[in-house]
Curated annotation (Swiss-Prot):
Gene from which the chain derives: thiE
Pathway terms, separated by semicolons: Cofactor biosynthesis; thiamine diphosphate biosynthesis; thiamine phosphate from 4-amino-2-methyl-5-diphosphomethylpyrimidine and 4-methyl-5-(2-phosphoethyl)-thiazole: step 1/1
InterPro entries: Aldolase_TIM (IPR013785), ThiamineP_synth_sf (IPR036206), ThiamineP_synth_TenI (IPR022998), TMP_synthase (IPR034291)
Required cofactor(s): Mg(2+)
UniProt KW keywords: Magnesium, Metal-binding, Thiamine biosynthesis, Transferase
Residues binding 2-[(2R,5Z)-2-carboxy-4-methylthiazol-5(2H)-ylidene]ethyl phosphate, per UniProt: T134, Q135, T136, G166, V186, S187
GO cellular component, one term: cytoplasm
Protein name as annotated: Thiamine-phosphate synthase
Length: 211
């Protein structure tokens, strides 16, 4: 049963681009995307704070669900919609502080054991990856594939889920067909020959999410 210890999110979050700049956040919000994540890696809080502030302000202006990857203190300070954490960040993060601040929490998983860890934290949503081989980041685990993804989605039938990892425009329909509530994409948009067209096509497949 879906009883998170953090504020809930819609069961279907729809298309969920993960991008590394405020410029991309603004572009995608303007293109109709309503769930996004700002993921800037390996910088100190003071180096990313201005970008976090700007991204959160844009999210508010468009009434969107904007998640901040990793920089949870800044997300709390500036009242983001939510925070996304990887497994490696869970142990080093004060989840009770995020909870008390009223922020939603998303957690990455790569196998059944990590799903168990995520469920123990009772987050707002669980991300399932990586579905396909990905060039976006170095992954210690093997790709899950559609069959494993479908099994995880069935296991988490009451939970908002997000599929991530190597999801292209061509692969997106098969991913959505597993019943997953959202698809997170990176290069399918940011490296597309025509990002506006790619975004529109992905929105057609995954939707903007439930209200």
């Amino acid at each position: 049963m879906y009883q998170p210890e953090f504020p809930p999110v819609p069961f279907r979050l729809g298309l969920y681009p993960v991008v590394d700049s405020v410029q991309w956040i603004e572009r995608l919000l303007d293109a109709g995307v309503r769930t996004l994540q700002l993921r800037i890696k390996d910088q100190r809080d003071e180096e990313v704070e201005a970008d976090v502030v700007a991204a959160i302000a844009l999210g508010r202006r468009y009434n969107a669900r904007l998640f901040i990857n990793d920089y949870w203190r800044l997300a709390i300070k500036h009242q983001a919609y939510g925070v996304h954490l990887g497994q490696e960040d869970l142990q080093a993060t004060d989840l009770s502080t995020i909870r008390a601040a009223g922020l939603r929490l998303g957690v990455s998983t790569h196998d059944d054991m990590e799903i168990d860890v995520a469920l123990a934290a009772r987050p707002s949503y669980i991300a399932l990856g990586h579905v396909f081989p990905t060039q976006t980041k170095q992954m210690p685990s093997a790709p899950q594939g559609l069959e494993q993804l479908a099994r995880h989605v069935e296991r988490l039938a009451d939970y908002p889920t997000v599929a991530i990892g190597g999801i292209s425009l061509a692969r997106a329909p098969a991913v959505i067909a597993t019943g997953v509530g959202s698809i997170a994409v990176v290069s399918a948009i940011t490296q597309a020959a025509d990002w506006r067209l790619a975004t529109a096509q992905l929105l057609e497949i995954a939707g903007v999410g439930d209200e």
